[in-house]
């Protein structure tokens, strides 16, 4: 079966569709249509508008989705997903990136792109997706001593499989390939210019992807991937490539944040107050760890930043929370005005 090569398992087959329909998997998403692979081949399909009219953007098909397709090449429904990667837009709307993958490969290069704060953000959405995160550090040929990078990674990604690779010499690929399960679906996350396209070519053993050079002055690259697309490799792995994303908003699920910052979460259990904000309360275990140096200040500040961002998106998506926030600020402003009126004049 063609679809078995594309990751079709009993999990999806047990989701029944109409007898006149076919199972398919979305292999690429364009503005007005989708590329779908079925047992009858690959073709471009459109949505049956009436079936998706009232659904939010997060319920529309994404690359990796298994779908129900009609004989008229229309997508009738999206099957239940096993994993999902999405990001929050500036308008606090969820934008779907990919679905039904086994591994989330976070690709960073060992030049100016190496950024622990960004890595923590990627790890948060990777854990949140339900897939297994793997860190891929490209351009390993540029570094003589990898020890400092390894030590930094252990502070934010302890236990996450990490591979230093060189696309030119194929260094590191043998170990990675040995650890990936056969016929797995991999989604690649990372900024532009980190070598994702070259990485795919190295993993595939063929020039599947167009590559571009990066500027030497700031290590920034051009977008060689302009849309989300799936590739079936000869060795059986399925790769979902995504356009470079240097910045993106995290979603509303707390689980990914708790896993990425598990050290902070564990410390918070020892705080004196159960509702401790970990800023200035007495008996705060998090603040005590900051004071004695066992907790990194940068790690803590990034945790706070992502907490605030998640709370912001939650308020934007919940009228009740938004109203509570407005009421809270009204109370603060009222107290401030009362204080200014009653304070002694100089």
From Swiss-Prot:
The superkingdom of the source organism is Bacteria
Q: What is its main location?
A: cytoplasm
Q: Might you give the EC number(s) for this enzyme?
A: 3.6.1.-
Q: Which residues form a coiled coil?
A: none
Q: Which residues form the CP-type G domain?
A: 93-248
Q: Which GO terms describe its biological process?
A: ribosomal small subunit biogenesis
Question: Which cell locations does it reside in?
Answer: Cytoplasm
Explain how, and how many, cofactor molecules are bound.
Answer: Binds 1 zinc ion per subunit.
Q: Which UniProt keywords apply?
A: Cytoplasm, GTP-binding, Hydrolase, Metal-binding, Nucleotide-binding, Ribosome biogenesis, RNA-binding, rRNA-binding, Zinc
Q: Where does GTP bind?
A: 138-141, 190-198
Binding of Zn(2+), residues: 271, 276, 278, 284
**Classification via CDD domains:** YjeQ_EngC
| Listed cofactors | Zn(2+)
Q: Which GO terms describe its cellular component?
A: cytoplasm
Pfam entry (one): RsgA_GTPase
HAMAP family linked: GTPase_RsgA
Task: Give the matching NCBIfam families.
Answer: ribosome small subunit-dependent GTPase A
Name listed for the protein in its UniProt record: Small ribosomal subunit biogenesis GTPase RsgA 1
* Organism of this sequence: Listeria innocua serovar 6a (strain ATCC BAA-680 / CLIP 11262)
Per the UniProt record, the lineage of the source organism begins with: Bacteria, Bacillati, Bacillota, Bacilli, Bacillales
């Amino acid at each position: 079966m063609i679809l078995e090569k594309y990751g079709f398992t009993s999990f999806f087959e047990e989701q029944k569709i109409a007898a006149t329909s076919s199972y398919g998997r979305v292999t690429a998403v364009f503005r007005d249509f989708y590329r779908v692979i079925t047992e009858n081949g690959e073709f471009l399909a459109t949505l049956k508008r009436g079936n998706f009219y009232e659904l939010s953007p997060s319920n529309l098909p994404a690359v990796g989705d298994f779908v129900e397709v009609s004989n008229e090449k229309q997508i009738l429904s999206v099957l239940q997903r096993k994993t999902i990667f999405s990001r929050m837009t500036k308008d606090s709307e969820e934008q779907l990136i990919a679905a039904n993958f086994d591994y989330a490969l976070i690709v960073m290069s060992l030049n100016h792109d190496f950024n622990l704060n960004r890595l923590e953000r990627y790890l948060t959405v990777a854990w949140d997706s339900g897939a297994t995160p793997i860190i891929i550090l490209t351009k390993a040929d540029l570094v003589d001593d990898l020890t400092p990078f390894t030590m930094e990674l252990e502070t934010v990604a302890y236990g996450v499989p990490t591979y230093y690779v060189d696309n030119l010499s194929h260094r590191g690929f043998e170990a990675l390939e040995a650890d990936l399960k056969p016929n797995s679906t991999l989604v690649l996350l990372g900024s532009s210019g980190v070598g994702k396209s070259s990485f795919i070519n190295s993993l595939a053993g063929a020039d599947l992807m167009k590559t571009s050079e990066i500027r030497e002055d700031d290590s920034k690259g051009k977008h060689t991937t302009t849309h989300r697309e799936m590739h079936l490799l000869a060795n059986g792995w399925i790769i979902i490539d995504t356009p470079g994303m240097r910045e993106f908003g995290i979603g509303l699920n707390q689980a990914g944040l708790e896993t990425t910052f598990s050290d902070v979460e564990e410390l918070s259990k020892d705080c004196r107050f159960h509702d401790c904000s970990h800023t200035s309360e007495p008996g705060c275990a998090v603040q005590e760890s900051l004071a004695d140096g066992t907790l990194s200040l940068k790690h803590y500040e990034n945790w706070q930043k992502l907490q605030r961002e998640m709370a912001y998106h939650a308020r934007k998506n919940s009228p009740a929370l938004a109203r509570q926030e407005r009421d809270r600020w009204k109370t603060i402003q009222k107290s401030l005005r009362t204080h200014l009126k009653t304070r002694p004049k100089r």
